[in-house]
Amino acid sequence: MKPAIVILCLFVASLYAADSDVPNDILEEQLYNSVVVADYDSAVEKSKHLYEEKKSEVITNVVNKLIRNNKMNCMEYAYQLWLQGSKDIVRDCFPVEFRLIFAENAIKLMYKRDGLALTLSNDVQGDDGRPAYGDGKDKTSPRVSWKLIALWENNKVYFKILNTERNQYLVLGVGTNWNGDHMAFGVNSVDSFRAQWYLQPAKYDNDVLFYIYNREYSKALTLSRTVEPSGHRMAWGYNGRVIGSPEHYAWGIKAF
């Protein structure tokens, strides 16, 4: 072997050896920063290397920090890992909710504040569709089954939210109430940003929750404080601040 090639091989080997000697807190900082600045290709490559080096705890710690800090980028990071052949990293290093989301499993959307499952009405309200609400009783029937379908655009991941029983998509209506809130419906058509959503993870006690924002209006999906005679609470895109209060405005994602 030529001396130049030997030197090059030794140099490359030294780089890997040096990387393996870097303290975990430095590796965590490097990975966290890659995610926060939306350099997802770099974050994915770092994660693959860490996983191969049996340092999955570094990834887990970064994911937990992203969630604690309410970083939306956590969703894009997880999706790019999933998309780029590292589903095992998502399964092993992220909370189970991320796997449920990106595998398009049937899920329940449970409003943390009231413990109600999101569903669609039997009745159609004009051209708007079926009103969406938190069911006062039903937490188990196919009517509360949903799945999230990911879309990648402009370095962000959005979701269509499909009710699997009705085969209809969750949207916000165009009109607003006196408070500026948009009512939520289930519809057949998905040709509008009103039918696309983005998620922001949050931590409350031991629960991983998600704020669910509408792409068109940037308003969070919430349930009304008014209780219907049936015990239901209507779903709205809320015209107000929600960040910092996941116990009031965020949703749990549970396997159906």
Swiss-Prot record:
Keywords: Lipoprotein, Secreted, Signal. It is found in: Secreted. It comes from the Eukaryota. Detected in larval hemolymph (at protein level). Residues 1-17 form the signal peptide. The keyword Repressor does not apply. One of its GO terms (cellular component) is extracellular region. The keyword Signal applies. Pfam families: Lipoprotein_11. This lipoprotein belongs to the group of structurally related '30 kDa proteins' that comprise major protein components of the fifth (and last) instar larvae and of pupae. Belongs to the 30 kDa lipoprotein family. This is Low molecular mass lipoprotein 3. It comes from Bombyx mori (Silk moth). The gene is LP3.
